[in-house]
Regions:
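Active-site neighborhoods and metal-handling regions in enzymes and metal-associated proteins
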Residues: 1-345
Length: 345
């Protein structure tokens, strides 16, 4: 078994956080009761004993604001009726650019079956429409993300108060997740990275099983999930509480870029443009740190810039119901969007 997490688009549209939920929207249908229908899993005495009570139709309606609530086992009959009326059908799928799974997941299997059965219908992508909606956060969404960030900040403060040489990375992770649970977060928004010493050179190190040694740095990349909304924070601290002079130089170089970069995150700029500007800032700081010279930069291969050896990832990504939330790096930023700012060295 795996922990259940609601599909983000479905949660965004309905607020229903229960497995086997389906949402169908047919706003132009002549029958008003079919224009907006949510299907939820019908409970039983056995399910109630083993899994707990599921939502009633009334509860699902109160949560979602949808009047027409049906049991999931009614879906096929309703779908047949809707398909006899519809011409175009919009289907949902995971369109995250880095997503790859050789085995088709449930939504893709459903799409294939539907296309095979209704070959004369026109099928469209729902993702671009939902992306436009989810990119701009409402006041409520912004507050939930802010709360996730506050809980994450409390976890960071906890680590600052307990970290010492000899502590294990997994003990640090335990402190983080303890604070998450204490503040009613549903857990980490993603697998926490607790990387001491050379482990921090692996961008997505998640073993978290080494000892934090005296004189080393500890990189932590973690975030709480609260009400399905994510935080994402990366910080680096000295294990013994004091930076060496070189560690301080590197830390301050990244901090300067971080502070300047935040000022660039304004409506009108794209994430792609933003990342390029930050790359230039990081390049200048690396020259100042003596990692390479201006002359070497002038002679570098443009396709393999020298800064990539030390800074090989983007600085910002959208944040929301997903840690890497919906949005295109080529679209201009708008007021109401929420993004991370994570330069590193």
């Amino acid at each position: 078994n795996f922990p259940f997490r609601q599909q983000s688009d479905l949660f965004y549209l309905s607020g229903i956080d229960q497995e086997e939920t389906i949402l169908v929207l047919a706003p132009g249908h002549p029958n008003k009761s079919l224009r907006e229908v949510a299907f939820v899993k019908e409970t039983s005495e056995k399910i109630a004993i083993w899994e707990g009570q599921k939502l009633s139709k009334q509860e699902a309606s109160e949560i979602s604001g949808i009047e027409a609530i049906r049991w999931t086992n009614d879906f096929d009959n309703v779908l047949t009726e809707l398909m006899s009326w519809a011409t175009s059908v919009y289907l949902n799928a995971n369109e995250y650019p880095k997503y790859f799974n050789p085995v088709p997941y449930k939504d893709l299997r459903f799409a294939s079956e539907l296309k095979a059965k209704y070959q004369l219908h026109k099928f469209e992508r729902a993702a671009p429409l939902l992306m436009k909606l989810r990119q701009i956060k409402s006041d409520t969404e912004a507050e939930l993300i802010r709360r996730a960030g506050e809980i994450t900040g409390k976890a960071f403060d906890r680590v600052l108060s307990v970290i010492k040489p000899g502590m294990k990375e997994y003990e640090v992770q335990a402190e983080i997740e303890y604070i998450f649970a204490l503040n009613r977060a549903s857990g980490p928004a993603y697998q926490p990275i607790v990387a001491s010493g050379i482990n921090a050179c692996a961008l997505h190190y998640v073993d978290n099983n080494d000892e934090c040694e005296d004189g080393e740095l500890l990189l932590m990349d973690f975030g709480a999930e609260y009400a399905n909304y994510a935080a994402d924070i990366t910080r680096t601290i000295p294990v013994n509480g004091k930076f060496t002079s070189r560690q301080k130089e590197c830390y301050n170089a990244v901090l300067r870029v971080h502070d300047k970069a935040i000022q660039l995150l304004r409506p009108g700029i794209t994430i792609d443009e933003f990342n390029k500007k930050v790359n230039t800032m990081m390049e200048e700081e690396m020259i100042g740190l003596g990692l390479f010279s201006k002359e070497q930069v002038e002679k570098q291969d443009p396709d393999k810039p020298l800064y990539m050896k030390y800074f090989m990832h983007g600085t910002a990504h959208p944040l929301g119901l997903d840690v890497h939330d919906v949005g295109s790096k080529y679209d201009p930023l708008e007021a109401g969007m929420v993004l991370t700012c994570e330069p590193g060295l």
